[in-house]
Amino acid sequence: MATLTIEELAQTLQPAQAIAGLDLGTKTIGLAMSDLSRRFATPRPVIKRVKFTQDAQVLLAFAEKEKVAAFVIGLPINMDGSAGPRAQATRAFVRTMGEKTALPFIYWDERLSTVAAERALLEMDVSRAKRAERIDSAAASFILQGALDRLSALTRAAD
């Protein structure tokens, strides 16, 4: 497994390969999936965290079933640009996942993704209980959509 930049990913992806987005939390892992044309990110049900080994098994089974080509994982950078404990935990998660899969991981700045997801769910008039259930996957979808938009721009620039 390697960590790639979004530019490196753009060079290695084949047509019709899907990408998964992850929002790593302490209790859940938000999950989103791209379509095969890599234009749209769709939230998927969250993964309830148990222990790393079980979390990894669930994530890798999902990746195999959905034929995931890469993971875009939100990197929780502080507003001042520094990396706090959550960013360190995310990097440690990716390092440990690297021992279990050859799939590449791409870090994506997730600043304000949860705020944007919360706002979108509020605009859709989703109840407080349902918002709590869906917020992590909605945030994963925002993270993935940002990466997909960047991939699209890189592809257009290369043509």
UniProtKB/Swiss-Prot annotation:
InterPro entries assigned: RNaseH-like_sf, YqgF, YqgF/RNaseH-like_dom, YqgF/RNaseH-like_dom_sf
E.C. no: 3.1.-.-
One GO cellular component, as annotated: cytosol
Superkingdom, natural source: Bacteria
Keywords in alphabetical order: Cytoplasm, Hydrolase, Nuclease, Ribosome biogenesis
CDD domains for the chain: YqgF
Primary localisation category: cytoplasm
Alphabetized SMART domains for the sequence: YqgFc
Localisation per UniProt entry: Cytoplasm
GO molecular function, one term: nuclease activity
Biological process terms in GO annotation: rRNA 5'-end processing
Keyword Nuclease among record annotations: yes
Function: Could be a nuclease involved in processing of the 5'-end of pre-16S rRNA.
Family of the protein in this entry: Belongs to the YqgF nuclease family.
Protein name: Putative pre-16S rRNA nuclease
